Amino acid sequence: MTRLRAVLLATVIALLGACAAPTPPAEARRPMPAGQPTAGKAEVLWLGQAATRITTPGGKVIVVDPWLTTNPKTPPGFKQLSALGKVDLILVTHAHSDHLGDAPALARLTNAPIYNGGGLGQALVSLGMVPAAQAQRFGKSGTVMPFGPTGPRITAVHAEHSSELALKNPATGKDETHYGGEPVGYIIELENGFKIWHMGDTGLFGDMRLIGEVYKPDLVLIPIGGHFTMGPQEAAIAVRDLIRPRFAIPIHYQTSPQLSGTPEAFKAALGAGAAAGVIVPQPGEKVDF
């Protein structure tokens, strides 16, 4: 009888533990691209639209454009902001709701600073959405080192887009539009020298060539959906003729009917002889570099 009671008690404890424990998002990982070093790798996790989590070789976690909780492409396991785990830095490319998204809530949850181009941070502070100490402002071409001289280096660069902040004022409940700073992209240079250009939202512009020549990004995360940004044809011109990175991950597509561009159309426009390797992860899939 004592043994039966012990077995029943152990079973109950196990069931209660299973109910109490949160279910982590299922992990999917793509093999490292050929030719990449196995030491000092970086991890890129795309979560739909422009939302991206980058884990650096030194263990820093940088989240870009975290629109997650209402993003139809974000996997269910990542719609809880706590599923992102540790966050050291938040980058916002511009003020539109599908990019600013959950950044203020994530900043409050993790105490991570939000870096943004131009005046978006001041608007967030004045609206009471972000503490002033967490709203870090810098300008295009002004490289910053949030983690000190040996950590990742962040440079804001031009993006051909807009950046109005349209929202319901949390204090008044009224719909308002505020200045959202300048739209930017980010060159993120990791501790091992690997460079990522997260382009945010942008149309095609000629200085992509100059940015590519100056910063020499290894990887671009490039919008291909069209309507509000480059479509597949323009994105192919940017990658093949202007930037010439080693790798390209298409983003900002198929989230709404207007964003009709597809990775297949992007690859077809690039052509078979393109130097850049196109990687098409599913939302929630990790890619190592």
Curated annotation (Swiss-Prot):
GO molecular function annotations of the record: hydrolase activity
Pfam family name, one: Lactamase_B_2
Keyword annotations: Hydrolase
SMART domains named among the record's database cross-references: Lactamase_B
InterPro entries in the record: Metallo-B-lactamas, RibonucZ/Hydroxyglut_hydro, UPF0173, UPF0173_UPF0282_UlaG_hydrolase
Family affiliation: Belongs to the UPF0173 family.
Name the record gives this protein: UPF0173 metal-dependent hydrolase H16_A2129
Lineage, broadest ranks: Bacteria, Pseudomonadati, Pseudomonadota, Betaproteobacteria, Burkholderiales
